[in-house]
Amino acid sequence: ASYRGGFADWLDLSWFRGADWGIAREALYNVTTGELLTGEDDSAVSACGVGVACLQSRQDSRSILYDLNGGEAVELGRFDRAVNTYTPGCVVLSGSDDPDSPYTLIDLDSGEKTAVQRYDTDYRSGNVAVLTTDNILKVYDGTTGALLTDVEAAPVEEAQYISVTALPDGYALLQYNDENYDTLAIQTYGGEGLLWSSAGEAEQYTYASYLTNTANGPLL
């Protein structure tokens, strides 16, 4: 076995297979309290936010979320699928009961499940943006979990592929591409809805990037 640090007061312990020295399982051990979090027999440990750990089975992706910010671990939920991202109050999982939806959004307070077609996490703020299968765009605050944006997106009918980019301050970008991955439209959304769209512009845009925020929304 070996260990590495990743969470305050917690060690990530690893057990190795003798044959090939591959990692067989991981667990978390609190050096102050002696608490041991083992998960499944083949669990892997990963971070899912500040002070939030996920123990996930390597075989069937069953996952357990723990909040490690206090003196003791607090279990946030157990899931039958892999955890992709977490923000206080909700989690995005791989897979869905809907065969046409690749992800599921779960409200941890109510247990409500929502089919999701795309999601993204902003590396600056930790904000999480999800686009549901019925084209509702939601942006959650990465620190508090507050719902910053909850608006209906305006899909482009000709689009075959959609991508979502989460931005600070509750903003998000949607990009629609055709079957050849050529950009058809880029849209910017905030809490008040659609702020800007390249559809109908004389110039064709293929890329947009967040620079800073203004009183009228993000400056791209």
Predicted regions and their residues:
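Entry beta-strands of beta-propeller and related beta-repeat scaffolds
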Residues: 20, 170-172, 217-219
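Surface-exposed loop/turn elements that mediate protein-protein interactions on large endomembrane-trafficking
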Residues: 1-7, 25-41, 61-78, 99-118, ...
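Hydrophilic extracytoplasmic domains
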Residues: 157, 177-182, 189-220
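Repeated scaffold domains used in trafficking and secretory/extracellular systems
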Residues: 4-17, 41-51, 78-89, 116-127, ...
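Beta-strand C-termini and the immediately following turn/loop, strongest in propeller blades
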Residues: 12, 18, 23-27, 54-64, ...
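Short intrinsically disordered, low-complexity coil segments enriched in acidic
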Residues: 1-15, 28-34, 55, 86, ...
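Intrinsically disordered, low-complexity segments enriched in proline/serine/threonine
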Residues: 101-104, 157, 170, 220
